[in-house]
């Protein structure tokens, strides 16, 4: 989200420590910033998972300043799992919405692993 207190030096140190620790199996990436996800994937390699909130089929800004990116783009950029909240629970048909997110993420995975 905009205005967070993280800075690049802090983020790098946290990621480097996590990569080096066998007990860390993954990281949370930013779904609204595919370039940052790709950089995180390049840093952590394929041995760690990346879980990604901040995705929505309706790409854009949320009502509380959060940003949403495309779920397919998130997976193409290196995410292993998308985390979806309001895109499903606020949908008129949550089951259909969940299926749409599954389809979008699966599409990204097939394209990524081509």
Q: Which residue ranges define each predicted feature?
A:
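Conserved anion-binding
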Residues: 1-49, 56-60
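Short flexible/disordered coil segments
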Residues: 4-7, 55-66, 89-93, 109-114
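Electropositive phosphate-/nucleotide-binding environments in soluble metabolic enzymes
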Residues: 8, 12, 34, 68, ...
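Glycine- and other small-residue-rich loops at beta-strand/loop junctions that grip anionic moieties
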Residues: 29-30, 63, 85-87
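Catalytic cores of alpha/beta
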Residues: 38-40, 59-80, 96-101
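Residue-level detector of anion-binding/catalytic polar loops
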Residues: 49, 80-81
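Generic beta-sheet signal
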Residues: 51-53, 85
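C-terminal helical cap(s) of enzyme catalytic domains, especially alpha/beta-barrels
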Residues: 75-77, 86-114
